[in-house]
Design a protein with these regions (language model features):
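Short glycine-rich catalytic loops that host catalytic nucleophiles or stabilize transition states
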Residues: 30-32, 132-138
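Gly/Ala-rich beta-loop-alpha elbow adjacent to hydrolase catalytic centers
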Residues: 57-66
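Short beta-strand/loop motif that positions the catalytic acidic residue
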Residues: 99, 104-107, 111
Length: 155
């Protein structure tokens, strides 16, 4: 089961969501609003009982995917995180137990919204199976996003 989690100021009608809807018609692409807690409660309801999850999270959606995987690791197959806001909680905001699913992060070297060094610090600690791609792009990853091999990334 594939799911895309959009960023804080985006929606299920954003550029990435539209791309995924066209490319993967069976992908879940819900809308989220409200606080992190409200968003996570909605995500819990949407994914209740589902397994084999291949989660794509963009920015704040990357944080959501990370938190979900920490709480439900056996149900998550892989994470693909795009400029994820994993620095939002700071290094001490995550449990000591790492998330052992495969994780791919694509992060722009010119990201002025979510600093790459902070993401590297947190992600390196919580994702032992991390593949980090630093790309010549900004936070939105407009130059990079469509060039990725999504069929391989999402298996």
């Amino acid at each position: 089961m594939k799911i895309f989690l959009h960023g804080l100021d985006s929606s299920s009608r954003g550029t990435k969501a539209v791309f995924f809807r066209e490319r993967f018609p069976d992908m879940l692409i819900p809308d989220f609003s409200g606080s992190l807690e409200e968003r996570m409660q909605k995500l819990e309801g949407i994914l209740s009982g589902r397994t084999g999850l291949r989660m794509v999270g963009s920015s704040f959606g990357g944080l959501m995917a990370t938190l979900f995987a920490m709480q439900h690791e056996p149900r998550v197959e892989r994470l693909v995180l795009l400029a994820p806001a994993v620095n939002f909680l700071g290094p001490s905001g995550y449990p000591e137990k790492p998330v052992s699913v495969p994780v791919w992060i694509y992060h722009g070297t010119h990201d002025e919204v979510i600093p790459l060094p902070a993401v590297k610090t947190v992600a390196g600690r919580i994702f032992p199976r991390l593949t980090l791609h630093e790309v010549e792009d900004d936070h939105n990853l407009h130059r990079t996003f469509r060039t990725l091999d999504w069929d391989t990334l999402l298996g």
